[in-house]
From Swiss-Prot:
Domain of life: Eukaryota
Membrane-traversing stretches: none
InterPro entries in the cross-refs: Phenazine_PhzF-like
Keywords, alphabetical: Isomerase
Enzyme Commission number: 5.1.-.-
Species of provenance: Mus musculus (Mouse)
Name of the protein this chain belongs to: Phenazine biosynthesis-like domain-containing protein 2
Length: 288
């Protein structure tokens, strides 16, 4: 088996920042177990598999492809940064001639369009609903101790718990916060929660680049202690902060050690555009 494989840093214009994803281009069907084996070998938060939908398709000329995402532990239903990385590989390395690519995925058809300053992902919007604190108190306290919480929301579509920290906290607090993810899967083992999102409101002003909100994302339930930059969580962070701030266009920053920037646009048709850059840092051949 020889497969072309790449690593691209997503949601950044600088190598070794953003979120790295492996991208594997499949000329033909891959054995089902091989997807997970490769993802485990790559040992990144996500490995994407881009496949031709028809035998006559071509990675340079075609505009529709199948796309699946795997963490080192399991297949995942939606991944923004690995979708961005996949589009970047097709645009930059396979010189795809189309301005917009369509990916057929577990979460429906997702589009990625090329712009001068990045790639725009066309994703669904996922609503969040108020979550009773007492139902998740043990989980939250295990993760962040006595850190003050302002709001808690739950997304049944993505199984993410969104925890907004007090507005008294800023970016530096979120960046330095020690989050204990190790006990979380044992505390919440019903399958209701697969991801924990912490978020704070952005600054009202200042000399540095402004962001409307900041976040960090943790998914130990699927083998990812902290995800560096998570495009898919902005399908719920976007609408949440849009309602809170009264804005449709926002700029977001994910405060992991690597960090990453995302431009968010809530569209009238109920979908969200998520734009970011991508840098391909590795190209090779999987030979196993």
């Amino acid at each position: 088996m020889k497969l072309p494989i790449f690593i691209a840093d997503a949601f950044t214009a600088t190598a070794f920042r953003g979120n790295p994803a492996a991208v594997c281009l499949l000329e033909r069907t891959l054995d089902e177990d091989a997807h997970q084996d490769i993802a485990r070998e790559m040992n990144l938060s996500e490995t994407a598999f881009v496949r031709k939908l028809q035998p006559t398709d071509d990675f340079t000329q075609s505009s529709r492809f199948g796309l699946r995402w795997f963490t080192p532990e399991a297949e995942f239903p939606l991944c923004g940064h690995a979708t961005l990385a996949s589009a970047a590989v097709l645009f930059q390395k396979r010189k795809n001639t189309n301005s917009t690519l369509t990916f057929v995925t577990m979460s429906g058809e997702l589009k990625a369009r090329r712009e001068e300053d990045g790639i725009v992902l066309d994703f669904p919007v996922y609503p969040t609903f108020p979550q009773d604190f007492h139902e998740v108190e043990d989980l939250i306290k295990a993760a962040i101790g006595d850190t003050l919480v302002q709001d808690i929301r739950y997304s049944p579509d993505t199984k993410n718990l969104l925890v907004r920290l007090s507005d008294s906290y800023d970016r530096s607090f979120l960046e330095s916060l020690k989050v204990n993810t190790e006990p979380l899967p044992a505390i919440e083992k019903t399958g209701k929660v697969r991801g924990l999102i912490l978020t704070v409101k952005g600054e009202p002003g200042g000399q540095t680049a402004l962001y409307d909100f900041y976040s960090r994302c943790f998914a130990p339930w699927v083998g990812v202690a902290e995800d560096p930059v998570t495009g898919s969580t902005h399908t719920l962070l976007g609408p949440y902060w849009s309602e809170e701030l009264g804005k449709k266009e926002m700029r977001a920053f994910q405060c992991s050690r690597r960090g990453g920037e995302l431009d968010i646009n809530l569209r009238p048709d109920g979908r969200v555009d998520i734009k970011g850059g991508a840098v391909i840092v590795l190209e090779g051949t999987l030979t196993a």
